Every structure is written in C-alpha cells, then in structure tokens.
Curated annotation (Swiss-Prot):
This is NADH-ubiquinone oxidoreductase chain 3. It is a multi-pass membrane protein. It holds the Pfam family Oxidored_q4. Its EC number is 7.1.1.2. Core subunit of the mitochondrial membrane respiratory chain NADH dehydrogenase (Complex I) which catalyzes electron transfer from NADH through the respiratory chain, using ubiquinone as an electron acceptor. Essential for the catalytic activity of complex I.
Length: 115
C-alpha cells in the first residue's frame, strides 16, 4: 500500500510540474537572458558556433556500435548457462549484425572524413 501511495504521489507531482512548465512560459525573453555568461564581459566570439554534420554522424554511429558492443560484455557469464547452443547462436547473430552494420556504414562512406 505504501508503494502504491508513493508511486501515485510521485506521478501526480511530476505531472503537476510538467503542466506548470507549459502554463507558465517565460513571458519576456530578452537578449541578455539568451546570451552565454561571460563573467560580465561581452562574449569574444559567438557561443553557438556550428559543428560539422560529419562529426555528428560519426559520433552517433560510434555510440550505437558502442552500445551494441556493451551487450556482449556479459557473454562470459552467459556461457555458463545450461542452454549453450541458444546463447552461442544469439551471440553470433549479434556479432554478424554488428559486422553487417559496419560494412554498410563503410560502403555508404559514413566513416570517411573527406568532404
């Protein structure tokens, strides 16, 4: 009962805060609020400089492959299971999917830095 009560209160509080943020927007934004803080000085250069889209795509690709590799980390413990053929097959399928994804990225020139 206490868990249900705590869950209900937390859910209602979260919903209340979300509703308040939509109902009470910032009514008078001005330029000084949107500028980055520079210790009281005017910024020396623009704070919102664009970065390369190629870098963004390579970074996202790295994160996806890194996450998929992290799925293989518990493999030594999983090999101690009684259903070893299923575990080996699923691990090999994951490695094959990773290899196919890397091959696709490489063939589509997603890993090249040349513009």
């Amino acid at each position: 009962m206490n868990f249900v009560l705590a869950l209900t209160i937390n859910t209602l509080l979260a919903l209340l805060l979300m509703i308040l943020t939509f109902w009470l927007p910032q009514l008078n934004p001005y330029m000084e609020k949107s500028d980055p803080y520079e210790c009281g000085f005017d910024p020396a250069y623009p704070a919102r400089i664009p970065f390369s889209m190629k870098f963004f795509l390579v970074a996202i690709t790295f994160l996806l492959f890194d996450l998929e590799i992290a799925l293989l980390l518990p493999l030594p413990w999983a090999l101690q299971t009684t259903n070893l053929p299923l575990m080996t097959t699923s691990s090999l399928m994951l490695i094959i999917i990773l290899a196919l994804g890397l091959t696709y990225e490489w063939s589509q020139k997603g890993l090249d830095w040349t513009e």
